[in-house]
Amino acid sequence: MLKTLALISIGASCGAILRWFLGLMLNAIFLPIPLGTLAANLLGGYLIGVAVSMFNALSAVGPEFRLLIITGFLGGLTTFSTFTAEIGVLLQGQRIMTAVAAIVLHVCGSLIMMLLGMGTFALLRTCFR
């Protein structure tokens, strides 16, 4: 149990640091919608698609590695709380259309990126057989 907690914690720390770094690098580029949070969620969506597909296809991958990557790293990278807070700020500022655009970009974008990640894994798996 302690090993599992350590793996999740290490993964989550790494994911959160990457999310913070993306915010530092990207949030000032386009002020209406913080691009760092969007990039974190889209990248996380893509990587979750790859990871889920890979773990389903490769039964030799142990549950600890799944917890490290999916629960830990990708859980720390993606962020519903920051997304929600940013939408709240937009709504408080009466920027309804910007809030709606951000919601669509985050939710639909993450789902599309997840499907692209799954497709990428399927394509790579076919190419390297």
From Swiss-Prot:
Compartments, as annotated in UniProt: Cell inner membrane
Protein's GO biological process: cellular detoxification of fluoride
Coiled coil: none
UniProt key word RNA-binding: no
Regulation: Na(+) is not transported, but it plays an essential structural role and its presence is essential for fluoride channel function.
PANTHER family, per the entry: FLUORIDE EXPORT PROTEIN 1-RELATED
Name of this chain's protein: Fluoride-specific ion channel FluC
Record organism: Desulfovibrio desulfuricans (strain ATCC 27774 / DSM 6949 / MB)
